[in-house]
Amino acid sequence: MDSLISNTAAINGLLARFGVKFGIYKNGEFHEQLFPYDSLPRIIPADEFAEIEAGLIQRVDALNAFLRDIYTEKRIVADGVIPEDFAFSSSGFLPACDNFVPPNGIYSHISGIDLVQAKDGTWYVLEDNLRIPSGASYPLIARKLARRASPETFKNNSVDRNDDYGLLLREAMESVNPDRKSTRLNSSHSRKSRMPSSA
């Protein structure tokens, strides 16, 4: 762990060299800035992570159910759960998609759910990003560089892998491909059985 922390500057230097950046809008203008790496990891026990994961799966399934309803039967509006003006005047509502049902009824295939943890340890959802969530590559390259900088940290601790993300993403996309044949991919540490229907 000490070697990981001591190599923070070197890891951030490599991230800058590789051009790992993220974009933000400020005062109506788009800006890019380097992705900062914090070498002190947030350690989440396996049982707690499993509970968070189950909650996120449930949440994404609920969000997809909401999108299916808002573009088809619109019961959530008819029942007065949300006002009609609020739903259909939103910049995120796409009239061209009205009455459109994608394969398997999945509207959001990749979801970026931002989480925060309170002082008492409770996790909260900060926001749901369903349009074009970015940032999947950040933990992948950060983990790769961290392993290179401090291999003993990962050797001496049980750390869940994340390098099968590409395989899981492909499986998720293949699952909603109406023309697919049997294309299931095999990963030695695949977590497919725990994936939500919308990935």
Regions found by a protein language model. Give the residues of each.
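Preference for protein termini
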Residues: 1-199
